[in-house]
């Protein structure tokens, strides 16, 4: 089963860097990282993460979804050949790894499922300075906070705040995006952690089989091999999705 119920506590030590070490990240990410931080790196984890997210937002116009190995996906996105929120989240993961930032990738769906919402991808990074996980939506360029406290919020804080949270952008001007309302201010919105995603394994299969099989077949091969990722739902019972 790809989907599993979990708890907030059980996910404390579940993050992308466990499966993906710096030495396994493709070389193009290191080359682009030099460009991102050509003026030097900020000191804090959150400021480094924001710098990465800002560069990606300013240099990737987005477009169609990509089903490519990570290095090919990054190349395509930089060249203006597509990229949706999940593509942005996935390449952000790799930049965080090479900058020694703990990172997680989350999907957001509706429970019960509602086909008018297409789903969304976002990230969390662990800030050593704040000693907490911080939700950062790379494709929307936003963080979240409580009205009277400017400390950025974790994903769990956002989804258990009873909509008392606000968001702010780290772009030049604030944005009003209907998807922000749909996925962060909606009682049906349910986050799930993408757990145990091994970038090297998916890169290997996608590179060797992408001209021979559809992407969903490649993912099924990986699932049969026992090396697939899973979706972990800490706040809602995923079994209610189609009831």
Model-derived features with residue positions:
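Detector for Asparagine
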Residues: 5, 17-20, 33, 43, ...
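A structural signal for well-ordered alpha-helical scaffolds and beta->alpha junctions
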Residues: 49, 89, 172-173
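Charge-rich, low-complexity amphipathic helices
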Residues: 74-75, 118, 239
């Amino acid at each position: 089963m790809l989907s599993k119920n979990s708890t907030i506590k059980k996910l404390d030590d579940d993050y992308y860097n466990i499966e993906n070490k710096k030495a396994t990240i493709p070389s193009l990410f290191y080359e682009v990282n030099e460009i991102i931080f050509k003026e030097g790196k900020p000191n804090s984890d959150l400021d480094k993460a924001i710098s990465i997210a800002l560069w990606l937002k300013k240099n990737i116009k987005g477009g169609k979804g990509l089903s490519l190995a990570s290095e090919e996906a990054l190349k395509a996105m930089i060249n203006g050949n597509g990229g949706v929120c999940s593509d942005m989240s996935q390449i952000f993961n790799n930049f965080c790894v090479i900058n020694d930032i703990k990172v997680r990738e989350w999907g957001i769906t509706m429970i019960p499922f509602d086909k008018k919402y297409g789903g969304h991808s976002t990230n969390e990074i662990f800030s050593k300075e704040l000693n907490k996980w911080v939700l950062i939506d790379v494709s929307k360029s936003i963080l979240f906070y409580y009205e009277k406290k400017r400390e950025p919020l974790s994903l769990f804080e956002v989804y258990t705040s009873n909509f008392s949270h606000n968001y702010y952008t780290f772009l030049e001007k604030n944005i009003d995006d209907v998807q922000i309302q749909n996925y962060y201010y909606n009682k049906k919105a349910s986050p799930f952690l993408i757990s145990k995603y091994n970038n090297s394994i998916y890169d290997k299969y996608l590179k060797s089989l992408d001209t021979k099989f559809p992407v969903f077949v490649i993912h099924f091969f990986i699932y049969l091999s026992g090396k697939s990722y899973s979706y972990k739902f800490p706040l809602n019972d995923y079994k209610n999705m189609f009831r």
